[in-house]
Amino acid sequence: MGMILEVITGIGVFLAGIIARLGIVLVVMLALALPILAIAVAIRGIRALRLWAQGFRPAGGVRFHTGLLYAAGHTWVRPEGDRLRVGLDDLAEKILPWAVAVALPALGQKVKAGEPVVTISAGGREARVAAPVSGTVVMLNASVAREPTLLKSDSYGRGWMYSVEPEDRSWRKLLTGEEARSWLQGEASRLARFYEERLGYAMADGGELRAEPPVLMGEEEWKEVTRAFLRT
């Protein structure tokens, strides 16, 4: 009996030593992880503040810029003197997760609001983008033609597409401010429902909106998406 007790005691001491060592390891790991987590949270907060200072606001999982006007086909417009600069909004950028080629309109070309003027090749599919306003194309972004990935990486900045001289002042009726933000947020919700109900793809709940890559869709599914959201 005494020998059994000694064995049990020895096992207990051994297990206690292991548990103590594991506890020390966990404490050390936690001590190392907390500063890393704090740094990650701080970086995220700094990035959010920087985007806020630049005029970006969240809108249902996509980014909205306060200084722009927005058209139904998910393009933005920025007045620059007597010209209007045109680019893709963040929801269009989500639908087109990457681009391998961009065909822009020609300089001097007359464009009409609602008619396709840009063709983007993305993920094995093509998407046509409608002009937000009627007028004459007076400038093209050569950078985005050479480097189509700018449409994804900087859609509100260096990824702009072309500038147009409007034929009239009807562009002033485009959505802006809180009205535009509310519309874009509604469009983000509509896109999530569309993917789930019509195409059977579940999008992430909360946080950043993530659309299904075009390459994973059939041709008819892709046409449904572009008709419903890019209006082409």
Regions found by a protein language model. Name each.
Residues 2-232:
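Contiguous, well-folded functional domains in the mature portion of proteins
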